[in-house]
């Protein structure tokens, strides 16, 4: 499609490169480079193809993974829960019938779809990527336009390799400066959501920029883009750079040799032009961000670890005051109490937000030489089989096992209550996942979102605490 010569954002460039046709109302037929599929949102889509006599248009651009319902315990045993077993069996039947590449449950490469895609080189800069999952935005860390779609759209992409979409607005969130000790990408993202709220990015694609973002490794950038959804955005992006190219090089599905160098030449053009227009701009100072944790039932209910739980009486808006009170009642907290010192029952380190090798290393650095507090259940769930094997090669599994953690198989696990890993009513969990809604990790479970390092600190102390205090002890 023809494009203007005016300065363009990264989002605009990727969008324009993939528009097949622009309709009168502004809706575009958008070509999709990669379609990622999992067991929960695909059964009806494949059945729709079957009923209409259609095939998958680009099986070579489609990849399937089982992750949401899979058990993370003993894989040698059959899946006990009937609905979970049926969904995985249905996925296996569908990918075989329609010729879609699949990472099966017992494959060394199986894992969470948003971990597998980047680590395999399936997701690459400049691509359009969709999946029937809201956290598809994770892949934007590579400089791709990646977003979640519904089941009917899954069928449409399977059949046509296109999707009908209207372009989003542009938003740039810049984080400038150097973060302090103990501050991670998760803390940066929670600070952003604390600033703009869970509706702050509605209707926008967020480009994360600034010196603090450039300093992040790829795992950190994936954490940021993963939770752009919790900021209300359609997707999140980080412009590709040398860090990106070094990460992609040598991945199984990435270009090789001269093709890789040619790809890098194109990828270097994927940056917002000077003077490009952003509908919304937000800037944060990195040095003002400290380790953080959520207190309520929304990701925007976030506090620095030295903060106090808000009081409804301090909120002039009656509706907002009622929301605070409901969250306090659900979470079993008192207005005005310090969030540090809140006891935890469970610690979960995993999910598509924070289950990569770098996340496990950060947690192990806190855990090493310590032990899980009495009465606390702590579990590590690697994001993929490859992450698990790499961690074991470094001896991280031994660090966690010696400390009293459970060392599990790859999967979505306790991020959501769709598999055997879930909270029981009233249990309080320090979790590295992305959502702390009521019942998200199990009926009446209480979730505090935090970084892997903060979760590890909670595991060994039995309470929410400032990880910087533990790091001081080892210096």
Swiss-Prot record:
Binds 1 [4Fe-4S] cluster per subunit. It holds the Pfam family Aconitase. Keywords: 4Fe-4S, Amino-acid biosynthesis, Branched-chain amino acid biosynthesis, Iron, Iron-sulfur, Leucine biosynthesis, Lyase, Metal-binding. SUPFAM superfamilies: Aconitase iron-sulfur domain (SSF53732). The keyword Amino-acid biosynthesis applies. It catalyses: (2R,3S)-3-isopropylmalate = (2S)-2-isopropylmalate. The keyword Iron applies. Gene3D superfamilies: Aconitase, domain 3. Its cofactor is [4Fe-4S] cluster. PROSITE patterns: ACONITASE_1, ACONITASE_2. Pathway: Amino-acid biosynthesis; L-leucine biosynthesis; L-leucine from 3-methyl-2-oxobutanoate: step 2/4. Belongs to the aconitase/IPM isomerase family. LeuC type 1 subfamily. This is 3-isopropylmalate dehydratase large subunit. The gene is leuC.
């Amino acid at each position: 499609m023809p494009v203007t010569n005016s300065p363009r954002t990264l989002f605009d460039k990727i969008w324009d490169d993939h528009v097949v046709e622009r309709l009168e109302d502004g809706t575009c037929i958008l070509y999709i480079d990669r379609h990622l599929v999992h067991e929960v949102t695909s059964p009806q889509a494949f059945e729709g193809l079957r009923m209409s006599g259609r095939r998958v248009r680009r099986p070579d651009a489609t990849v399937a993974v089982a992750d949401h319902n899979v058990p993370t315990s003993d894989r040698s045993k059959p899946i006990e829960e009937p609905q979970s077993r049926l969904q995985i069996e249905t996925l296996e039947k569908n990918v075989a019938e329609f010729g879609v590449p699949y990472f099966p449950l017992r494959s060394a490469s199986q894992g969470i779809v948003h971990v597998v895609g980047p680590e395999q080189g399936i997701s690459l800069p400049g691509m359009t990527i969709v999946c029937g999952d809201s956290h598809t935005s994770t892949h934007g860390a590579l400089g791709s336009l990646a977003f979640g779609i519904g089941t009917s759209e899954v069928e449409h992409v399977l059949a046509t390799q296109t999707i009908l979409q209207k372009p989003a607005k542009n938003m740039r969130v810049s984080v400038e400066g150097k973060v302090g000790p103990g501050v991670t990408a998760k803390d940066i993202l929670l600070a952003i959501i604390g600033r703009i709220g869970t509706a702050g990015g509605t209707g926008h694609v967020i480009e994360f920029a600034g010196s603090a973002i450039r300093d992040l490794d790829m795992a950190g950038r994936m954490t940021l883009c993963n939770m752009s959804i919790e900021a209300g955005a359609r997707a999140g992006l980080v412009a590709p750079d040398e860090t990106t190219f070094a990460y992609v090089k040598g991945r199984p599905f990435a270009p090789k040799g001269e093709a890789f160098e040619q790809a890098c030449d194109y990828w270097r053009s994927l940056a917002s032009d000077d003077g490009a227009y952003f509908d919304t701009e937000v800037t944060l100072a990195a040095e003002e961000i400290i380790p953080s944790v959520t207190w309520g039932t929304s990701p925007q209910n976030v506090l620095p670890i030295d903060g106090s739980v808000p009081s409804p009486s301090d909120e002039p808006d009656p509706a907002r005051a009622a929301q605070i009170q409901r969250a306090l009642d659900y979470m079993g907290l008192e207005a005005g109490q310090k969030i540090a010192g809140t006891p935890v029952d469970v610690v979960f380190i995993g999910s598509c937000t924070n289950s990569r090798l770098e996340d496990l290393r950060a947690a192990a650095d806190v855990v090493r030489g310590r032990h899980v507090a009495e009465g606390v259940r702590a579990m590590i769930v690697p994001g993929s089989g490859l992450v698990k094997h790499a961690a074991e090669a470094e001896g991280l599994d031994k660090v966690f096992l010696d400390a009293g953690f459970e060392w599990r198989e790859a999967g979505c696990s306790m991020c959501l209550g769709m598999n055997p890993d879930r909270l029981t009513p009233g249990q309080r969990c320090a979790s590295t996942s992305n959502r702390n809604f009521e019942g998200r990790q199990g009926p009446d479970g209480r979730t505090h979102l935090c970084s892997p390092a903060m979760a590890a600190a909670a595991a060994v102390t039995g309470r929410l605490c400032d990880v910087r205090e533990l790091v001081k002890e080892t210096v």
